Amino acid sequence: MSAANPETPNSTISREASTQSSSAAASQGWVLPEGKIVPNTVFVGGIDARMDETEIGSCFGRYGSVKEVKIITNRTGVSKGYGFVSFVNDVDVQKIVGSQIHFHGKKLKLGPAIRKQKLCARHVQPRPLVVNPPPPPQFQNVWRNPNTETYLQPQITPNPVTQHVQAYSAYPHSPGQVITGCQLLVYNYQEYPTYPDSAFQVTTGYQLPVYNYQPFPAYPRSPFQVTAGYQLPVYNYQAFPAYPNSPFQVATGYQFPVYNYQPFPAYPSSPFQVTAGYQLPVYNYQAFPAYPNSPFQVATGYQFPVYNYQAFPAYPNSPVQVTTGYQLPVYNYQAFPAYPNSPFQVATGYQFPVYNYQAFPAYPNSPVQVTTGYQLPVYNYQAFPAYPNSPFQVATGYQFPVYNYQAFPAYPNSPVQVTTGYQLPVYNYQAFPAYPNSAVQVTTGYQFHVYNYQMPPQCPVGEQRRNLWTEAYKWWYLVCLIQRRD
């Protein structure tokens, strides 16, 4: 029997390496599959989407010269969460497997690389029945190297802490699409629409973990669309409009749990629309305009409980409109312009109590307008344009102290415009086109206290002042000479 099966040194080394790696793997809770241990190669599990092959190779460079790093992906190119690291020289695989390696704040699962053995049927021993069946014939968990050698990953015992990032598409023919920008860690952001014929689309930006943001519209023919931005966990933000024929649309941004944000307009014929952004629980934000013929609309952003945000203008013919964003209780936000013919409008965003936000332009014929965003007390934000015929407008958003943002165009026909976003102190961002009839506009972002942002006329200083005194003296001297001759 000994002559039939001689034991070579290589087989002894292979058996010892297998025994050592098996003990190291057992210490980490693995059940190694049948096969031959590949020397100088380590299995690496727990790889997430943030890790690439270059970084992993640099991490394992402390143990020896890395020959190749291979991250296993599926047919769509998405990482399966594991891979293999092979070394050029002989390394102590048992030492590497027994070490604790943390990468990007996450502990990696290490083990020996196992090469699948091609066994004949007569040499296969009967094995006990396993609960989990082996992978299908397409070998989703197998890595093939250029030498046509096949490696199996060690079977890791279930761990409730372990997170899996595999993607499972419920409907292969689903029209859902995900367009991503800068990618952060994303888990299970595939969509599982209830109706495969739904025209649901999701456009994502910076991705944070997103769970179950699929829509389940009450009516499959509803033109419901959701445009998502920075995604936080979103639950049940489907729309169930009271009237299936309503043109209701919701565009969501940062998503928080949203409940009952469907609109129930008092008049089904009202052109009421709601555009939602950062969604918090929203209750009763339907519009009940005092006048059914009023063109009142409400566009909501960060939603807090909203009460009584209908507009009751002092003059029914006034073209006043109110656009609300982050909603807190709003009182007295109707506009009472000093001049009933003034085309004054106010569009509010984050709503806090607002006082005295009417515009009192220096020239009653000025078409000045003010649009406010995050509302805190605002004082003296009237515009005093240098030219009374200038169609100057100011639309403010996130406001920090703003100085000198009036426009003094040089060319009246210039279509120059200035659009600002998050406002920090802004100086001299006026446009100086050549014509004073310019349709210049300034749009700013969130509103904080704004003081004295009118542009006062500049007084002469320094050399300019001395030159003015010299000119004045010359004129005065001439006047005196003329009077003396008379």
Curated annotation (Swiss-Prot):
InterPro entries attached to this UniProt entry: DAZ_dom (IPR043628), DAZ_RRM_vert (IPR037551), Nucleotide-bd_a/b_plait_sf (IPR012677), RBD_domain_sf (IPR035979), RRM_dom (IPR000504)
Pfam families per UniProt: Daz, RRM_1
Disordered, as annotated region: 1-27
Signal sequence region: none
Domain DAZ: 167-190, 191-214, 215-238, 239-262, 263-286, 287-310, 311-334, 335-358, 359-382, 383-406, 407-430, 431-454
MF terms (GO), sorted A to Z: mRNA 3'-UTR binding; translation activator activity
Keywords, ordered alphabetically: Cytoplasm, Developmental protein, Differentiation, Nucleus, Repeat, RNA-binding, Spermatogenesis
Span of domain RRM: 40-115
Tissue: Testis specific.
Single GO cellular component term: cytoplasm
Composition skew (Polar residues), residue ranges: 1-10
Compositionally skewed regions (Low complexity) per UniProt: 11-27
GO BP annotation list: 3'-UTR-mediated mRNA stabilization; cell differentiation; positive regulation of translational initiation; spermatogenesis
Subcellular location: Cytoplasm; Nucleus
Assembly and binders: Forms a heterodimer with BOLL and DAZL. Interacts with PUM2, DAZAP1, DAZAP2, DZIP1 and DZIP3.
Main function: RNA-binding protein that plays an essential role in spermatogenesis. May act by binding to the 3'-UTR of mRNAs and regulating their translation.
PANTHER family: BOULE-RELATED, DELETED IN AZOOSPERMIA PROTEIN 1-RELATED
Similarity comment: Belongs to the RRM DAZ family.
More details: The DAZ proteins (DAZ, DAZ2, DAZ4 and DAZ4) are all encoded by a strongly repeated region of the Y chromosome, in two clusters each comprising an inverted pair of DAZ genes. They are very similar, which gives their indidual characterization difficult. Thus, most experiments do not discriminate between the different members. One can therefore suppose that reported interactions with a DAZ protein involve all the 4 proteins.
Domain notes: The DAZ domains are essential and mediate the interaction with DAZAP1 and DAZAP2.
Protein name in the entry: Deleted in azoospermia protein 3
Organism: Homo sapiens
Gene it is expressed from: DAZ3
